Amino acid sequence: MAIEEKQSRFRISDIARELQVSPREVLQFVKQEGGKVASTSSMVGEEMRDMIFGNFSQEKKLVDETRKIRAEKKKRLTRLEEQSRKAYEKEQQLKESLSSAPSPAPAAHTPEPVKEPFVEIPARHEPAVSPAAPAEQPVIAETPQPESPKEEVVATKAPEAEAKPVEQPEKAAETAVEAQPEAQSQQEPGAEESAEASQTLVQTLPDSMKTYEAPQKIGGLTVLGTIDVSSGSDRKKKSRKKSFKENAAELKDEFEGATSGSSEGGEAGRKKVAKAAGEGESTTGGEDASGKKKKGKKKKKVEVDDKVISKNIKSTISGMDDSGSSGSRQKFRKMRRMERERELEEAEAMREAEKSLIKVTEYASPHELAELMGLTAKDIIQKCFTLGKFVTINQRLDKETIELIAMEFGFDIEFTTEVEATTTEEQVDNPEDMKTRPPVVTIMGHVDHGKTSLLDYIRRSNVVAGESGGITQHIGAYEVTVEGDRQITFLDTPGHEAFTAMRARGAQVTDIVILVVAADDSVMPQTIEAINHSKAAGVPIVVALNKIDKPEANVDKIKTQLSEAGVLVEDWGGEYQCQEISAKKGIGISELMEKVLTEAEVRELKGNYSRDIMASGIIVESELDKGKGVVSTVLVQRGFLKVGDPFVAGNSMGKVRALMDERGKRTDEAGPSTPVRVLGFEDMPQSGDVLTVMESDRDARDLAQKRQIIKREHEFRRSTRVKLDSIARQIKEGLKKELSVIIKADTDGSIQALADGLMKIHNEEVKVQLIHQGVGQITETDVLLAAASDAIIIGFRVRPNVNAKRLAEKEDLDVRFYSVIYHVLEDVEKALEGMLSPELHEESLGSIEIRQVFRVPKVGNVGGAYVLDGKVPRDANVRLLRDGVQIYEGQLDSLKRFKDDVKEVDSGYECGLSLKGYDDIKVGDVVEAYKIVEKKRKL
């Protein structure tokens, strides 16, 4: 417990830092809320912390959004750094490959950089240069300027490239065709001389045309850079210088994103020209061709890496800053990208949350917890040891311990019942199968306010006659046809306080609540409770003010009390419909039904009427019939429940043997909102369980067995824990008295009401221990269990069989029979009061003053005393006071008048006395006489 308290305390300054507000503001708020704090270093509990967060909700929202933005920015910066690192590694690899590459090899790929940039241009001029590769050679000679000596040099150095691949003529032809348009557009009068020079050039290469293709291509490209006579020289020099000396600088500039879109286009154009021109000047004539080939390959690799690096970095920068995007399309793409990233992050966060959320049933073992958390059982046990709990690997842990362990390991716990842990797959409703269904109306209100009388008049039958004391003992479900052949299903709930669970269950399965309030009474606690149940379930309320025919009826008083309870009727400007009725005389009943049907039409109640879907419903009530077995009242919610359907309901299963309405008439099927009595249960289901039709008996049995196993584990753990706790408590505080009880009743709802009522009757010393509960008559097994447990048997509207009655008389057991629940609760309360230890009170009898002390041989000191007040009996308890301080407490050893022993001495008389076991009596001591009186206690 100390650990839990420590973890639930928070410092005010830490809370203020988390909210990013002034600690003094938080301190002032805590003081306004009544918190006992002295400074910003004071600690507050978890409840006060939640109140602080609620008061500073806007600040907390801003802080959470800021943290989220920072987290997203941090993630993007991390991705940018990772991409930059990869780009830097690629650059280093590129430099290493350029420095280690051999000189002859690059020529094989020299034409590729020139091929890619201009591949679209020849498409418009291709018909003019359609001849094959050998015929294209004269065309190449048309492009150069009249610098024929330079072409002679290139031709003479051609033998160095004899080992080149055969496909180079085709590439050279393409390059020549690409260069032709510019050459034709800027052709000068000296072009005829260049044509003659080209003819002489072709004649000097009779046998080595294939090996000459690559140099011829390179030679033509070298001259191609000088086509623009007006301003081509500067561009040529600049492009050559940049491609030769600033390859690394270009890479760095693009890497840093410094170049704009227009400058990138210009640089790209210059790079294309530079590549076409051979990319670099040769320092010596003999190394010109090989140098150009090497530079060409280097530039090819650099260009590919530039594109990848530039694309990655620009996309990252544009994702971080709006200035990086230009145009609506780029902005739209950026927004879509950010949206996808946000969705991915949210999905990842949800997956992480699901990973940290584990669903367990209560009383799981350390081994099961370890499997769910992905840990070892040793880790769980060690954590329990550190928390002060000594457990074994298969020991069942309670709910608090499981929550504490999960919090220590950073997991969220969600507890499920045995039914939720084995839930069947939810079937999807087809909109075409959804049709209007009859409303389910629950009648609620205080006991004796006329709920059953109202239903009695609507059904035009005497329901109350079958109820003991005129009080409804269980939920009744009835289907009624009102005017206009409209169907309404009514649920009649008990009104007295013992049936709180039943009213809550009725509110959960209903569509509309009729709240019956007696006009001659007032709004009672059960009326308020019914209102709260209805509001919690989100069910509309129609108020019925009953007994208006009585002279003492006061409608306005009831409406005032209802408004104070949060139910403001329409007559007073509220939203709740109200109708004044008399259930006995039938006044206002038809108007009440119209309002109920109107409310149902507004809500547009739909039900699945498909015959292909598996039916399901709610167990409203269960009982054990002598000739029929277990009979349950089921309110069908979807589909059609038919005879022969296998089903599972809670921990029980079965097969529908028969269906009957509330009047005992057999039927073959029941649709939505239809109450029906079902025969065929193997075990007694609990009220409120969901009945689900299964595909086969085997599926139903397997599911029911799984639920039964989990339930047995829970019950075993609960009983074991109670015994262990009671042993420790009895050792520490003394024996706690228990009244063991066995309950047998006619219906499951009555058992639940009795159990809830009996559990409320207890205090620190006595309590009711419910040994067993069941539906049906009292049997020999119940009697034997009561004899072994020293328990009493309570039969609620049931009797024992012959053998059980004979055995109970033989064992001298206390078997009691009741038909009204109040009598059970009253008798059990009296029995518990009799088990309570009586209260002890001290009653003063008188006081005696010691005036002289005598020494008597073989007796000791004897005091001569005078009775100041009261009457002192011989057997009274006494205490000796000296100067107001208690010296002795005990009993009188002797009391005498003169020499005679007396039973008592009245006020104003002298006497002699001696104390039992005490001899130090002195003059002036005062002896007080008193007795202990026992007083009966009440719960």
UniProtKB/Swiss-Prot annotation:
GO molecular function term, any single one: GTPase activity
Region (G4): 546-549
Location of region: G3: 492-495
Subcellular location: Cytoplasm
Keywords: Cytoplasm, GTP-binding, Initiation factor, Nucleotide-binding, Protein biosynthesis
InterPro entries in alphabetical order: EF-G-like_DII, IF2_II, IF2_N, P-loop_NTPase, Small_GTP-bd, T_Tr_GTP-bd_dom, TF_IF2_bacterial-like, TIF_IF2
Residues bound to GTP: 445-452, 492-496, 546-549
Biased composition (Basic and acidic residues): 81-94, 112-127, 148-173, 244-255
Segments passing through the bilayer: none
Listed NCBIfam families: IF-2, small_GTP
Function: One of the essential components for the initiation of protein synthesis. Protects formylmethionyl-tRNA from spontaneous hydrolysis and promotes its binding to the 30S ribosomal subunits. Also involved in the hydrolysis of GTP during the formation of the 70S ribosomal complex.
Protein name (Swiss-Prot/TrEMBL): Translation initiation factor IF-2
Organism expressing this protein natively: Chlorobaculum parvum (strain DSM 263 / NCIMB 8327)
